[in-house]
């Protein structure tokens, strides 16, 4: 991509936007003008309002200070929690729709405004999504893909639930607005409660061209620059390609341009084998409490491999990073074919026996095991950001400090797995 640097600058301390939050851009064919609606955030009340900037070329932007949309307090919405405007054109209704994350009586809602001219907005009496769980839903994003409509959003989470990017889908926009939520349960038509990644990917927004649609979000830094540290409210941009399955559900895969960028081949150098490991020409077969360590990674790495589990068998295996012989703690990504999960854990591993002490997951996400027992794995790393793709279906983003320029390994903790065709590349 090409960076055009800062597009819309923050305002002064006495204006509505000394800090700027996310929004969306829409093109008005009639006026040949781009409209970006964004969140203005400040310390004094009302803390958040919706603001506007316009452009003729989508590069040079001018703030329209005549536009200011505040929370509809007359309808009971909180004046301080009103953000993340998403605007799209509804060709059927011949109007623009704006979705905004809002709060009412302590519960989160995605509310809706409509307009025919992008300047005057009317509040719809019913929310776009009536959030029965009360969670605060941020960054709403609605789009049509093929014959389905989708809403992608970021659930801020609660004390007992993580913050994640999720989605709903339906065959029409009206059905999407009235998505059936029964007995407090997530719609059964959406597997794994609509999780699109793990808890280290947030604030996902989408955009597409004539061929593909992509999902961008950020992978947070962690306090103390420790893999186990508390997530910070900042991070690195991560992009996924959205894959629409035949039944309308969504999967994630690597964008082709990112995959192609890692074009410089790197020689795979084995350093150590521990435990029950059988080596053939292009594969390793590992059993419980075994691992194979390889030489230090670069700053930017692509790792591809195929993992096969014997028929009528179940296994737990994965990749280990910061896998140093003089350091007991390893950052392991567990592919739990046996338990239907992907997990990141920092665990202690015995260098002589391969035995390890279990620990709680730093991040995790549910998956459906491969029906044919075969896992095609692609890993992309840049400095401390690590994204794992499984079978072109699941994405698992994490922050792993000290990953770069340190050894890595493949391992098995339960059952048996054969890992073949391991390839490394960089850019």
Describe the residue ranges of each PLM region:
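Carbohydrate-active catalytic/glycan-binding domains of CAZyme proteins
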Residues: 1-418, 423-427
